[in-house]
């Protein structure tokens, strides 16, 4: 027997996506991917005050050389965030009172040996930045500056650094209720393969994995005076 149950009016589910902004982002991303001959790219536009995602584009290069939307890389790809993670590292040290914006680091010629491995700034071949303060370290995205500070102040207690990251919820999923959402992987000192080099390299965005949308949400919270929020959809009551 087939039971036919009539629908009942409920809330309307509305997307936060702005079609015009989506088109602009798609073209901009595709053009840049072609210019760089890149394999995959993501572009997300978020409204600061509400955290609403106004545009989200995920492009992957196919076998025919063209770019297509194949998966939601922005929420599912577990990527090393690289230099975008430096802000979080500096914020932890600032909040713990370990440094101030004027704290200076001698980055030397742009190369610093750390536990037998070379930490390099991007301009090491031009002689590095020499002595610079924390503000300048962030401005020029100095690998040496950030890693030196975090290693200096947390090498005896790496868990305190990890706890600082967790205070900012950077290790938490966004709970978007969308299939395939990835959960950030922030390594702790009690885990396997947490070597002496892990902390300095982790501080500049390596040896850790975070989906792109999570990094955007973190920066959006900074712009939004510390309020972290993200939304793909919202509900509205049905009109009568």
For every predicted segment, state its role:
Residues 236-240:
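A short, hydrophobic C-terminal helix/tail in secreted or cell-surface proteins
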Residues 1-42, 62-65:
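Extracytoplasmic/periplasmic proteins that interact with beta-lactams or build/remodel peptidoglycan
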Residues 2-4, 17, 43-78, 82, ...:
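Beta-lactam-recognizing serine transpeptidase/beta-lactamase-like catalytic domain environment
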């Amino acid at each position: 027997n087939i039971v036919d149950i009539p629908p009942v009016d409920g809330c309307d589910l509305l997307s936060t996506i702005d079609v015009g902004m989506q088109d602009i982002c798609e073209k901009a991303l595709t053009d840049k991917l072609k210019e760089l001959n890149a394999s995959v790219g993501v572009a997300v536009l978020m409204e600061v005050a509400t955290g609403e995602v106004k545009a989200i584009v995920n492009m992957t290069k196919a076998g025919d050389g063209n770019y297509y939307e194949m998966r939601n890389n922005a929420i599912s790809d577990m990527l090393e965030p690289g230099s975008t993670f430096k802000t979080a590292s500096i914020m932890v040290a600032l909040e713990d009172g370990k440094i101030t914006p004027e704290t200076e680091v001698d980055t030397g010629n742009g190369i610093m040996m750390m536990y037998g491995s070379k930490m390099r700034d991007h301009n090491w071949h031009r002689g590095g930045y020499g002595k610079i303060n924390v503000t300048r370290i962030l401005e020029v995205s100095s690998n040496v500056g950030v890693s030196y500070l975090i290693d200096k102040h947390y090498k005896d207690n790496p868990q305190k650094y990890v706890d600082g990251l967790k205070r900012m919820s950077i290790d938490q999923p966004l709970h978007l209720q969308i299939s395939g959402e990835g959960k950030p992987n922030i390594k702790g000192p009690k885990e396997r393969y947490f070597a002496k080099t892990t902390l300095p390299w982790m501080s500049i965005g390596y040896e850790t994995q975070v989906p792109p949308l999570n990094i955007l949400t973190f920066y959006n919270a900074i712009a939004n005076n510390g309020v972290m929020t993200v939304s793909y959809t919202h509900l509205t009551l049905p009109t009568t």
